């Protein structure tokens, strides 16, 4: 099913608000196996909306419109669509009752234009609005499905997930549509695509869709099949081929984050973790303790932003700071050793470096050193040169830290299995 999303509202064209609805709809439709080919934004103008509908109806099988269902004169989506499809607008009694009740409960006068929000296309499928007044609706005309949704995200989003997606699924046919997202870190999008070029070029069912964001790359595999079991087998086979080539960078599925994967692995292996932070300013500890179950493995996060605190809290030797500076692999190792001595954790990690925007100790922004102590192994320092804003450098540092620990756990598990 080829889909198109039309956002209606002059405030979108003027940049007064962001079109977050478009992003959300594309995400939800992709999960449902619906291909979105076009996005359009139209102001509150009947003529231009009519022209947009004429173009969309020629090239798309599903047209979703958001916004313009309110009570004012510039809310004209329903009227334009009704005229375009030669359909009558009628009052939806359920919606009207809901609107009347809203005003009565608040002891407010209801103006006549509020009744406009209860108007729907005749014989349309109605999507009740549980968080606002204007209902959504869907109608099929000459093989094209038209879906009209309210503009406010708090009204539109639950309507889509709870009512629209099930409606669309019932109209796709009896095909099972299943998606699986593979998550990778430590490899760029271009390199990943190069490694998988023949698989991506030859994709049909499942389809393979790469996406890069903040140092990570995901692959969304989507399969369509009449049998759910066979669909899963097709996904398994495609995943196997992918992981044979780039499995070293794979860490999880769907919405799993590196932090969540780390907490899961630490908990399963019974390893404890503590952190010493300078560059990241406590972000690592804050993020990991946001994850349910982190208390089973995470002991402490110590933030030492100044050299004095590094010496007094973490016992970083003065000669390390004098000879090498705080932004150095030697300091990173000393910080990791210091927090290990304090907490007795199985795994300790430290972060030091320059987030920017200015250089420090002669080091350029993006210079990062991660210290790592893993059980009784020799401590090590990992050197990174990252790019981006101050916030991006910190975020990417956290992800690299998680990856380093996960890699050490993997090697430790492999060594343990070899001894069995």
Swiss-Prot record:
Origin: domain of life: Bacteria
Record InterPro entries: CinA, CinA-like_C, CinA_C, CinA_KH, Competence-induced_CinA, MoaB/Mog-like_dom_sf, MoaB/Mog_dom
Pfam families assigned: CinA (PF02464), CinA_KH (PF18146), MoCF_biosynth (PF00994)
NCBIfam families noted in UniProt: cinA_nterm, molyb_syn, PncC_domain, PRK00549.1
Family: Belongs to the CinA family.
Full protein name: Putative competence-damage inducible protein
Species in which this protein is naturally found: Halalkalibacterium halodurans (strain ATCC BAA-125 / DSM 18197 / FERM 7344 / JCM 9153 / C-125)
């Amino acid at each position: 099913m080829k889909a198109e999303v039309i956002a209606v509202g002059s405030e979108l064209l003027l940049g007064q608000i962001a079109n977050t609805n478009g992003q959300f709809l594309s995400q939800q439709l992709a999960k449902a196996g619906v291909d979105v080919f076009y996005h359009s934004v139209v102001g509150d103008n009947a003529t231009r909306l009519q022209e947009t509908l004429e173009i969309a109806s020629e090239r798309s099988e599903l047209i979703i419109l958001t916004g313009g269902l309110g009570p004012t004169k510039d809310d004209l989506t329903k009227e334009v669509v009704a005229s375009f499809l030669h359909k009558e607008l009628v009052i939806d009694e359920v919606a009207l009752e809901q609107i009347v009740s809203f005003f009565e409960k608040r002891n407010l006068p209801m103006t006549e234009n509020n009744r406009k929000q209860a108007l729907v296309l005749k014989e349309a499928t109605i999507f009740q609005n549980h968080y606002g007044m204007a209902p959504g609706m869907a109608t099929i005309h000459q093989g094209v499905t038209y879906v009209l949704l309210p503009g406010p995200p708090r009204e539109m989003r639950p309507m889509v997930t709870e009512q629209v997606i099930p409606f669309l699924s019932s109209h796709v046919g009896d095909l099972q549509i299943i998606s699986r997202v593979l998550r990778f870190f430590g490899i760029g999008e271009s390199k990943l695509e190069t490694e998988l070029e023949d698989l991506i070029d030859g994709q049909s069912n499942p389809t393979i869709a790469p996406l890069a964001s903040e140092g990570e790359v995901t692959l969304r595999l989507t399969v369509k099949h009449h049998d759910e079991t066979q669909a899963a087998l097709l996904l398994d086979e495609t995943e196997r081929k992918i992981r044979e080539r780039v499995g070293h960078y794979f860490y999880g599925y769907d919405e799993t984050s590196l932090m969540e994967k780390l907490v899961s692995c630490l908990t399963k292996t019974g390893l404890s973790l503590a952190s010493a932070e300078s560059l990241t300013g406590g972000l690592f500890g804050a993020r990991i303790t946001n994850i349910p179950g982190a208390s089973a493995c995470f002991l402490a996060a110590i933030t030492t932003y100044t050299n004095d605190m590094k010496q007094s809290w973490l016992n970083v030797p003065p000669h390390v700071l004098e000879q090498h500076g705080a932004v150095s692999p030697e300091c990173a190792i000393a910080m990791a050793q210091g927090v290990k001595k304090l907490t007795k954790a199985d795994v300790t990690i430290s972060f030091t470096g320059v987030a920017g925007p200015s250089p420090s100790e002669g080091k350029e922004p993006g210079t990062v050193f991660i210290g790592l102590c893993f059980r009784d192994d020799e401590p090590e320092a990992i050197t990174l040169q990252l790019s981006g804003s101050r916030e991006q450098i910190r975020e990417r540092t956290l992800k690299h830290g998680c990856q380093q620990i996960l890699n050490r756990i993997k090697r430790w598990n492999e060594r343990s299995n070899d001894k069995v």
